[in-house]
Design a protein with these regions (language model features):
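Basic/polar N-terminal segments that are highly enriched at the extreme N-terminus
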Residues: 1-5
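Conserved, well-structured core segments that form or line functional sites
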Residues: 97-101, 109-141
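A short glycine-rich, His/Asp/Glu-containing loop-to-beta-strand
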Residues: 15-59, 63-64, 115, 121-122, ...
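Short acidic-glycine-tyrosine-enriched beta hairpin
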Residues: 78-95, 139
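Generic beta-strand structural signal
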Residues: 64, 84, 90-92, 100-102, ...
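Short beta-strand segments in beta-sandwich/barrel cores
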Residues: 48, 72-76, 91-92, 125
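Short beta-strand His + acidic residue motifs that chelate non-heme Fe in jelly-roll/DSBH
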Residues: 76-79, 93-94, 101-109
Length: 141
C-alpha cells in the first residue's frame, strides 16, 4: 500500500461563524480531486461549533456516520426518535442505510463543542437505519 501523508495545514477549511471546520477529504465547498476518499473512508471532519448552534435536521442515506466529541456536549436527534446528548468518552454511530433524518447541536449555551465526524462507505446499501452510542470508558478491551 502506498504511504500518503496529508499535512494538517493542507486540509480544506471553512469558517461560517457558528462552525469552524477542517476537511481531510472533499466536502461541501472544499473540493480536491486528489482527496475524495481513502478506501471506504469518505469524510474526516474536525468541527468546532459555537454554543447553542448546530446542524439542522437533514437527510443521510447509505453511509456509516460516526461522531466523536472531543470537548463539550453533542445533542443528537433523529427520525428514529432517538434523542441523546453525548460527551467526550462517548461515540455515536449511525448506519443510515435506506435513509435517516438527523440533527446535531452543541448542547451548551456557554462552551464550544469540538468533535470529529467520520463517514465510511458501507459494504451493503439500503439496509435498515440504526443508531447507537457507546461509552468507550465502559468497553472491555
Amino acid at each position: 500500500m502506498k504511504t500518503v501523508i496529508d499535512r494538517a495545514n493542507t486540509r480544506g477549511h471553512a469558517d461560517y461563524g457558528w462552525l469552524n471546520t477542517w476537511h481531510t477529504f472533499s466536502f461541501a465547498d472544499y473540493y480536491n480531486p486528489q482527496r475524495i476518499h481513502f478506501g471506504a473512508l469518505r469524510v474526516l471532519n474536525d468541527d468546532t461549533v459555537t454554543p447553542g448552534m448546530g446542524f439542522d435536521t437533514h437527510p443521510h442515506k447509505n453511509m456509516e456516520v460516526i461522531s466523536i466529541p472531543l470537548k463539550g456536549y453533542l445533542r443528537h436527534g433523529d427520525s428514529l426518535e432517538h434523542s441523546e446528548v453525548i460527551s467526550p468518552g462517548d461515540i455515536q454511530v449511525m448506519s443510515t442505510g435506506s435513509g435517516i433524518y438527523h440533527s446535531e447541536f452543541n448542547d451548551s449555551k456557554t462552551e464550544n463543542l469540538e468533535f470529529l465526524q467520520i463517514w465510511v462507505i458501507p459494504r451493503v446499501n439500503n439496509t435498515k437505519p440504526v443508531y447507537k452510542s457507546y461509552d468507550i470508558r465502559q468497553v472491555d478491551m
